[in-house]
């Protein structure tokens, strides 16, 4: 059964963090589908949508105005989603590494 979670991840270089709402499958991996998050840059927020197409695939990250063929690549979901795990985002400026600091599980009744 899929669980909905909120992840807090910090940029390894410091200065900003990611807050992500996504589904996690029964094995602890990011569930297939479209999910939402934002970068907390301190003074500004940058919202994004990301999408995972298959079980072992990397995800694509889309910002406001991006077309479906212009997404950045993200490795969240390649490994199980757990506290202490790292993931990377690759964009035109390089590689950005994040570490998951906390996970909040939403419970449905």
Where are the model-predicted features located?
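A generic structural signal for short, solvent-exposed coil/turn residues
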Residues: 12-14, 42, 53, 81, ...
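A short, compositionally biased
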Residues: 1-4, 55-57, 80-85
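Short, exposed beta-strand/loop patches in secreted or surface proteins that constitute
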Residues: 22, 48-54, 78-80
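Short, compact, well-ordered microdomains
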Residues: 63-109
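Short beta-strand/loop turn elements enriched in aromatics
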Residues: 37-71
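N-terminal intrinsically disordered, low-complexity, charge/repeat-rich segments that act as generic
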Residues: 1-33
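A structural detector for beta-sheet-dominated domains
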Residues: 8-10, 21-23, 51, 62-64, ...
């Amino acid at each position: 059964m899929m669980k909905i979670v909120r992840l807090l991840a910090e940029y390894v270089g410091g200065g900003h963090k990611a807050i992500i709402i996504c589904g996690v499958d029964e094995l602890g991996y990011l569930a297939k589908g479209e999910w939402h998050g934002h970068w907390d840059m301190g003074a500004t927020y940058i919202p994004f949508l990301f999408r995972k197409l298959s079980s072992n695939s990397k995800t694509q990250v889309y910002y406001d105005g991006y077309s479906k063929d212009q997404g950045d690549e993200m490795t969240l979901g390649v490994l199980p989603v757990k506290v202490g795990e790292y993931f990377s985002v690759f964009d035109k400026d390089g590689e950005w590494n994040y570490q998951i600091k906390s996970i909040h599980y939403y419970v449905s009744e």
